[in-house]
Amino acid sequence: MKRSGIINREIARIAAEMGHMDRITVCDCGFPIPDGAKVVDLSIIKGFPRLIDVLKALREELIIEKIILAKEIVDKNPEMHNAILKLFSDAAVDYVEHSEFKKIAAVSSKAYIRTGEATPYSNVILSSGVDF
């Protein structure tokens, strides 16, 4: 058994397979995930687990050089927006329309991690960096 860090087998595997600029999407319980996509569904009930808790765990495992957010989060969910920015304060941030966000996720995500989050626009695309 691992001593620390992510113990979910699928997420640990995805994290280990991430290369520079690879992307994963961490999403709320209502996000439309394309058929055939690799998905780790952590959702149990609405609100659990929370998106921010999953992001905190991933932040400990991965180097994130950029995040992509739907620009609607700024006005529709400022509390979540601020929490995400605080967590990834050293990463570049791109904002796109929610419809564009879904397209980017569909074509560029190695995997989706579905949370129980049930607040508006609580979806993040994480782009992996390198430690050298």
UniProtKB/Swiss-Prot annotation:
Gene3D superfamilies: RbsD-like domain. Pathway: Carbohydrate metabolism; D-ribose degradation; D-ribose 5-phosphate from beta-D-ribopyranose: step 1/2. Substrate binds at residues 28, 98, 121-123. InterPro entries: D-ribose_pyranase (IPR023064), RbsD-like_sf (IPR023750), RbsD_FucU (IPR007721). GO terms for biological process: D-ribose catabolic process. Its EC number is 5.4.99.62. The active site is at 20 (proton donor). It holds the Pfam family RbsD_FucU. One of its GO terms (cellular component) is cytosol. It catalyses: beta-D-ribopyranose = beta-D-ribofuranose. The keyword Isomerase applies. Its main location: cytoplasm. One of its GO terms (molecular function) is D-ribose pyranase activity. It is found in: Cytoplasm. It is an enzyme of class 5 (isomerase). Keywords: Carbohydrate metabolism, Cytoplasm, Isomerase. Belongs to the RbsD / FucU family. RbsD subfamily. Catalyzes the interconversion of beta-pyran and beta-furan forms of D-ribose. Homodecamer. This is D-ribose pyranase. It comes from Kosmotoga olearia (strain ATCC BAA-1733 / DSM 21960 / TBF 19.5.1).
